[in-house]
């Protein structure tokens, strides 16, 4: 099986080959022909299944005809976080290497003026977080009446983050004749309601969920006292005694705990950075680059901020808080033990907690 049978253009197939990919993933194989046939698609798939290319590749093929007009994007992709939006932009840069398309990223933490200039030039692909998109719309800087295709990605995370009212508003602002691609890892009742309201006779594409953890990751539990300072002390002892610790991501359930733990680790002499939703974009980008380059050893993060991040070689994961959802546990520890490397994931369980995973 290869990409050539999916109906993609020669330019796209050449870019995929240049990127080193030879065969489509199941979500790509199932979704791409329906996208090219202009059908609405409901894709149930998690991050890591190749779903981003399942919409970027056919979009590139479809956008080879036509031109963008000022302030009127031809296609719109909604992402829950700035980092996911930036990664989709990178996907268009990689697979669109043979195209001359204007792609704009509209996210918080970046100057309105810079984004406004991009919109004025005309945009083929607009990738945005819901809040910043509506900010531009309300300022009169953006018209959504020319959107031919709408992608709503990570819809269940949108629900977790309280974005569903924004999503509903945006769906009503774009033409009802547009094509809609809707991706979610789970289908709670509220998400099902949204799909029934805004998708037209969609093709449902579902791939098996990678709901198991990899064999190359050692999973451990560590008991601690109930108080936050007890957990911080336990974490410090675990880090100091860890064998082969190259770097580590430490997960907290709440962004305020991310900031508190980060400051505590720094006070105790650890090389650490934080990643949470209240940081502006430049600070988040700088934190990630420091971690990727090995300039800091520890990255303290929330689930939402770390969703979809591509950091290939992480030796240790620490769950400072027991994750609320089992899926979050799988996502968290999936950051280590990649590509055949060994990894270690340790969950700290306070006296009053029960491990959920």
Predicted regions and their residues:
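Conserved helicase RecA-like core
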Residues: 2-357
């Amino acid at each position: 099986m290869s990409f050539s049978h999916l109906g993609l253009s020669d330019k796209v197939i050449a870019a995929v080959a240049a990127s080193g990919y030879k065969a489509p993933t199941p979500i790509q194989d199932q979704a791409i022909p329906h996208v090219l046939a202009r059908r609405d698609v409901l894709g149930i798939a998690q991050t890591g299944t190749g779903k981003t290319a399942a919409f970027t590749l056919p979009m590139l093929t479809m956008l080879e005809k036509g031109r963008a007009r000022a302030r009127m994007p031809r296609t719109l992709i909604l992402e829950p976080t700035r980092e996911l939006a930036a990664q989709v932009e990178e996907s268009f840069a990689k697979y669109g290497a043979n195209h001359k398309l204007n792609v704009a990223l509209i996210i918080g933490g970046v100057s309105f003026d810079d984004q406004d200039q991009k919109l004025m030039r005309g945009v083929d692909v607009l990738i945005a977080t819901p809040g910043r998109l509506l900010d531009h719309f309300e300022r009169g800087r953006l018209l959504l009446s020319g959107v031919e295709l709408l992608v709503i990605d990570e819809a269940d995370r949108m629900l977790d983050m309280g974005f569903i009212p924004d999503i509903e508003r945006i769906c009503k602002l774009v033409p009802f004749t547009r094509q809609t691609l809707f991706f979610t890892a789970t289908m709670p009742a509220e998400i099902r309601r949204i799909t029934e309201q805004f998708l037209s006779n969609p093709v449902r594409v579902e791939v098996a969920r990678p709901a198991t953890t990899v064999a190359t990751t050692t999973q451990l539990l560590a008991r601690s006292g109930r108080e936050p300072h007890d957990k911080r002390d336990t974490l410090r002892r675990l880090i100091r005694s860890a064998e082969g610790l190259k770097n580590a991501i430490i997960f907290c359930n709440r962004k305020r705990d991310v900031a508190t733990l980060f400051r505590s680790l720094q006070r105790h002499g650890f090389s650490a950075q934080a990643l949470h939703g209240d940081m502006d974009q430049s600070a988040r980008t700088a934190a990630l680059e420091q971690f990727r380059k090995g300039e800091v050893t520890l990255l303290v993060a929330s689930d939402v901020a770390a969703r979809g991040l591509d950091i290939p070689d992480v030796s240790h994961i620490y769950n400072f808080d027991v994750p609320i959802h089992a899926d979050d546990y799988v996502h968290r520890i999936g950051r280590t033990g990649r590509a055949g490397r060994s990894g270690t994931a340790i969950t700290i369980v306070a006296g009053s907690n029960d491990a959920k995973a």
